[in-house]
Amino acid sequence: MTTEKMLSRSENGVGYITFNNPEKHNAVSIEMWDALVTILNDFKKNKDIRVIVLNGAGGKSFVSGADISKFDKERSSKETVLNYNKKTQMVYELLETFPKPTIAMINGYCIGGGLNLAVCCDIRICSQKSKFAMPAAKLSLGYPFSSIKRLFDIMGPGMAKHFMFTADRINADEALTCGLVQKLVPEDTLVNFVKEYALTISKNAPLTIRAMKQIGIEILKNPDDRDLVLCEELASVCFDSEDYKEGRNAFMEKRPA
């Protein structure tokens, strides 16, 4: 599904999702969140798509957060705020637990809800000009437990508190240092770098990737909620597969699998 503000396509086993609202730095409305859910569910069912890349149009922003021009309609009362928050939390959870690897390709501003979205992806790759911020403290906004926990888990408690309490922006180098992003590349090579990175993942054994993704999800749960039986089953499926037999033989024969 593609809409005016949410674009999607697939190429060589990689699904691409673009936030297409560049005149507002790709600020997101309820309609865009709804479209994202539909696209993700379509990509989930498509067996030819093995990796997902999310990015923002225009070359200035990944996603700058909620569309403030829509606040009177979407976040002007307690009821509408609860509805909006419920919607975004559902999207974040869908992305965080997505069964295929997800990559946020960040070029420019990654702010507020855009950062919340990015940290739900497995991998974040940004250009040198990228800027990150969580301006809630300047806007009197509140974030739920899950959003704050993700930042604590990724950045560490001290850096996450500094980041949230001051609402200061950090640059790409700082983001790399604190683990907010995994790769930092020049702007003119970003698209090709991410394309090759995604292709590398898509060419690896799908059962192993699926197992590692799901086991990673279980690791981040509270210990009492982890499905360790599922983890063992996923690992066993890998060893029982034809992919494993071929990979083992290729290794022994010193040839590509």
Residue ranges and their predicted role:
Residues 17, 21, 36, 54, ...:
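Terminal peptide-recognition signature
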Residues 24, 180, 256-257:
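Activation segment of ePK-like protein kinases, specifically the conserved APE
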Residues 32-35, 84-87, 117, 190, ...:
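Hydrophobic alpha-helical membrane-association signature
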Residues 93-206, 241, 246, 253:
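Crotonase-fold acyl-CoA enzyme core
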Residues 1-12, 47, 59, 167-173, ...:
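C-terminal alpha-helix plus adjacent terminal tail
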Residues 1-55, 93:
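Conserved CoA-thioester-binding segment of acyl-CoA-metabolizing enzymes
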Residues 56-94, 140, 223:
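Glycine- (often His-adjacent) and acidic-residue-rich active-site loop
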